[in-house]
Amino acid sequence: MDREKLIAEIEKLKEERNAIIMAHNYQLPEVQDIADFLGDSLELARKAVNVDAEVIVFAGVDFMAETAKILNPEKTVLLPAKTATCAMANMLQVEHILEAKRRYPNAPVVLYVNSSAEAKAHADVTVTSANAVKIVEKLDSNVVIFGPDKNLGSYVARVTGKRVIPVPPDGHCYVHRKFTVEDVERARRRYPNAKLMVHPECEPEVQERADIIASTGGMIRHAPEWNEWVVFTEREMVYRLSRLYPNIKFYPAREDAVCVGMKAITLESIYESLRDMKYRVEVPEEIAKKAKRAIERMLEMS
């Protein structure tokens, strides 16, 4: 099926199923183009609370689809590809959290939304890269258990002055770990007039050399402040920014900064997902109930 026919079939099935497509900023350009709603993790979570459609097709990775299901237990949530997983989310096991709680019984558990529903069920509050600093600042504790991203945790510690206990000790995003100081220096040489926008999942030494440190939603807000940017995050963010601001120049810091899990979602898989109503996302009720409290607390605090 050619692309135009595929898109027409998707639109037809969306109408028949009363479905919407929610997509993350790291999706393939052709998936971004057909999304009803496009955003970062926080924006997608906020949107998921107020969805009118009966079916949500989630063009993102598994933990994002789980969050949508937790917030909409009565709706059908579809993840078009079983391989749309997040390696970092899988690094955090419940036992890591329980062990940290034994060592720091009074410390609140703050979990990045890039975590499983099972892990979120043990959290006091969840955060995204967009609101982590704001939420940790509001917590009445100078010590927090934070996971799974160590780099986001160190950024939060640096900005808030609070002590962050990372769980697991070396949780990370393999895409953002690719970026190095050499990439920063190369970007400065190649694009001398550009500023650097860096995601807080990048290594601290990369963050320290940035002009701004921001979530993907933050990058969108900051972009109009300058006319040329090098983007230190997943490469598809350059497409998203370029569409929003056609008169501003954006360059990927690395062409190989690719999230394989995100790229598992294609137009074909979205079409098949709507056609066959697969793959349905389910979260056990007890886990969903506990995880929902942590997610809703995040939405209230941000």
From Swiss-Prot:
GO cellular component, one term: cytoplasm
SUPFAM superfamilies: NadA-like
Cofactor note: Binds 1 [4Fe-4S] cluster per subunit.
Recorded catalytic activity of this chain's protein: iminosuccinate + dihydroxyacetone phosphate = quinolinate + phosphate + 2 H2O + H(+)
PANTHER family per record: QUINOLINATE SYNTHASE, CHLOROPLASTIC (PTHR30573:SF0), QUINOLINATE SYNTHETASE A (PTHR30573)
Family named by the database record: Belongs to the quinolinate synthase family. Type 2 subfamily.
Functional description taken from the UniProt entry: Catalyzes the condensation of iminoaspartate with dihydroxyacetone phosphate to form quinolinate.
Protein name: Quinolinate synthase
Organism: Thermococcus gammatolerans (strain DSM 15229 / JCM 11827 / EJ3)
Upper classification of the organism: Archaea, Methanobacteriati, Methanobacteriota, Thermococci, Thermococcales
Gene giving rise to this polypeptide: nadA
